[in-house]
C-alpha cells in the first residue's frame, strides 16, 4: 500500500468510525469499488491508534473527570451518580468485548465479500436511526444514565461487529429509544467506545509486535494513523454540533444514498 492510499483510507476510517455511517462497511466497499488491495494488520493498527488518539484528545476533560469520579467512588462510596458513571461505562463495554473476542473474525470472514448484504444493512440501520431520531422522547441527560441503560446500549454495541451497522449509529439509536437527548446519546456513545477502541488497538498491537512491521509499511502506517486521528477529531466535532443544533437525518440520508448507490452498481454490472 502506498502513502496516498493509506492517507485516503485513514481519512475514511477517522470519519466513518466516528459518524454513524459504519467504518467497516466503508473500509470493505471503497477499496473493492476502487480495486485497491485489502489493508493488512500493520495498517489496521495505525487506523485504530489514530482513532483512539482523536477520541482521547477530544474527550480529554471527560476522561479526566471520569477517572477522578471513579477514584472518589472507590474511596468514599458510590452515593452520587457521577461516581457511578465510570463503572456504568465499564459495564456497558463488557458485552461488546466478549462478542468481539469470540465473533469478530467469523463475522469479518462472512461479510468480506457480501457487498449486497452490507448495502442493505446500511439502508436498514439508517431507517432505524431515523425512527429513533423521530420517535425517541429525548428527555434524559447524562445524569440519568444507569446500569440498565448502560447494559442495553452496550448490548446494542455488539451489533456493530456487522459491517453496515455502525458502532456509533447503533449505540446512539439505542440511547435515543431509551429517552436520552441527541447530545447525550452521542456523547455517551463516544465514551462507551473508548475502552473498545483502546482494547482493539492493544490486541492488534500485540499481534503486530509478534509479527513485526514488514519492510516498506512504516510510512503508510504513519500516514494512516495521522489522517485517521485528524479526521476522527473533526468527525467528533461535526457530529456533536449537528446533534446539538439539528438532527441525525443528514447521516440517515447519506446511508440511504450510499446503500442505494452500491445496490445500483451491483445490479448494473
Swiss-Prot record:
Molecular functions (GO terms): undecaprenyl-diphosphatase activity
Record GO biological process: cell wall organization; peptidoglycan biosynthetic process; peptidoglycan metabolic process; regulation of cell shape; response to antibiotic
Pfam families per the UniProt record, alphabetical: BacA (PF02673)
Subcellular location(s) of the protein: Cell inner membrane
Protein EC: 3.6.1.27
Family: Belongs to the UppP family.
Its job: Catalyzes the dephosphorylation of undecaprenyl diphosphate (UPP). Confers resistance to bacitracin.
Name used for this protein in its record: Undecaprenyl-diphosphatase
Lineage: Bacteria, Pseudomonadati, Thermodesulfobacteriota, Desulfuromonadia, Geobacterales
